């Protein structure tokens, strides 16, 4: 490992430049994020090896991309930094059985999500630097933005700093992804994990999905055509989210009609009110005290019986049948699809 004392912005830049030419990085996993990380880091000048199960489904893809592929244990042995980019629920076994016995002393262990470390499923060896670097976007976007000379914002955190330059390693890694071209924000494993889980459960996945289904059911039960209900509560959601993404809630309000604005002001609080916020707080509490993670681990170890039941119920919801029929006629959707068909590596992937 490079051993440099970081005292100024200049010396930090010097550290990053020198580290780029000497750091060997093992990327464990080659899904959406793993591939984007590997390609961007290689193009930034790092020496990259990929750690995958021999004969696994992504081995050929990594080799076609020009990478040396080794088994995870061998990749870890030869790396100065090991990036764990596999789904959450396989990381504990991967670390305990494969990585911990093989990572060399003084190396850096990097995660893209803090769940396993924060909740104690993984206790990293004390002789390692342990950091987190998480681009705030899917792998396809991380790669695409890098290729056109831009970048996706990243957050980073330090859990263990044995070398006294773990933070600089995290920043160097984030810079290699292209994050420094956009924005890099320091956080903690606790903050990243708890806010990420809350966002997924209360808003981005659980909250929005339940809101859309309830809206669809309300219209259909009132006698409106399912096709019209689908357009109004699901299809047009993209228009609103794109405006949120570009400039926040105020930008969305600038681009909708005055009628829509007034409806937002008077009816939004009737649907999402103080009681909703109280239930959100209960969701957050379950995340903070580990209740959610405890239940999720038990569910996973039991073979996912409830998970499968919930998933099947969503698949059988009437909005899915209607949506499939309507989307089949939206020929432009095919042209908008990217090659990034691998599910993102995160807490929501099994």
From Swiss-Prot:
Reaction catalysed by this enzyme: (2R)-2,3-dihydroxy-3-methylbutanoate + NADP(+) = (2S)-2-acetolactate + NADPH + H(+); (2R,3R)-2,3-dihydroxy-3-methylpentanoate + NADP(+) = (S)-2-ethyl-2-hydroxy-3-oxobutanoate + NADPH + H(+)
Pathway membership, UniProt: Amino-acid biosynthesis; L-isoleucine biosynthesis; L-isoleucine from 2-oxobutanoate: step 2/4; Amino-acid biosynthesis; L-valine biosynthesis; L-valine from pyruvate: step 2/4
Domain KARI C-terminal knotted intervals: 188-333
An MF annotation (GO) of this entry: NADP binding
Native source species: Xylella fastidiosa (strain 9a5c)
Binding positions (substrate): 257
Positions bound to NADP(+): 30-33, 53, 58, 88-91, 139
Binding residues for Mg(2+) 2: 196, 232, 236
Residue sites binding Mg(2+) 1 per the record: 196, 200
The family this protein is said to belong to: Belongs to the ketol-acid reductoisomerase family.
Protein name in UniProt: Ketol-acid reductoisomerase (NADP(+))
Top-rank taxon: Bacteria
Ranges where the KARI N-terminal Rossmann domain occurs: 4-187
Alphabetical keyword list: Amino-acid biosynthesis, Branched-chain amino acid biosynthesis, Magnesium, Metal-binding, NADP, Oxidoreductase
EC class: oxidoreductase
Active site (UniProt): 113
Function in brief: Involved in the biosynthesis of branched-chain amino acids (BCAA). Catalyzes an alkyl-migration followed by a ketol-acid reduction of (S)-2-acetolactate (S2AL) to yield (R)-2,3-dihydroxy-isovalerate. In the isomerase reaction, S2AL is rearranged via a Mg-dependent methyl migration to produce 3-hydroxy-3-methyl-2-ketobutyrate (HMKB). In the reductase reaction, this 2-ketoacid undergoes a metal-dependent reduction by NADPH to yield (R)-2,3-dihydroxy-isovalerate.
